[in-house]
Design a protein with these regions (language model features):
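Phosphate/NTP-binding elements of NTP-utilizing enzymes
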Residues: 2-174
Length: 174
């Protein structure tokens, strides 16, 4: 890689000051929409991804792209902000399937993410090269939720999660 290319990449990286800007340059989508992500299909994701608040709640219909938004936000917080993140789904089975089908697909199609997660990339734990952790857990087992201190969390399909999920997750936030 030439000096000019490294300089150019450095300038681009410094301009990636929001979750959506970062995603547009770093996240490649798998089929059926291969290539760098854009928000044309789901423009409402931009606002949700770039909110800088302590807590964000989204009431939504099915198939609106918010699982992808949660996934992207989790990757951004872990990779770019070097924060530990907990991603919660209703059951451990769903969490495992989601990890393999969605997280791994995004990581495998995004060259910079492949490099970022090459050391530890298991079903329930993904670790960046700078040692930030992304935990993927089901809500049914409280043991899986209480054993990880994190600074950010995403609860996906909250209405299908165990009753005490929000309380357990809030206790984990440091």
């Amino acid at each position: 890689v030439s000096l000019a290319e490294r300089f150019s990449r450095g300038l681009v990286d410094k301009s990636l000051n929001s979750c959506t800007r970062w995603a547009e340059h770093k996240v490649h989508m798998p089929n059926p929409f291969p290539g760098l992500i854009n928000f044309d299909r789901f423009p409402w994701q931009r606002e949700v991804l770039d909110i800088d608040e302590g807590s964000v709640t989204v009431q939504k219909a099915a198939q609106m792209g918010f699982s992808i938004a949660g996934l992207i936000r989790s990757l951004y917080c872990t990779v770019e902000q070097q924060r530990d993140v907990l991603y919660v789904l209703p059951t451990q089975g769903l969490a495992g399937d989601f990890s393999k089908a969605r997280f791994d697909a995004l990581i495998e199609t995004s060259p910079e993410l492949v490099d970022e997660f090459k050391n530890v990339n298991s079903v329930g734990l993904k670790v960046t090269r700078k040692r930030a952790n992304l935990y993927i857990r089901g809500s049914v087992s409280s043991r899986g939720l209480v054993s990880v201190p994190v600074s950010s969390a995403v609860i996906d399909e909250f209405d299908r999660c165990a009753d005490n999920t929000l309380d357990l997750v809030m206790e984990r936030l440091s």
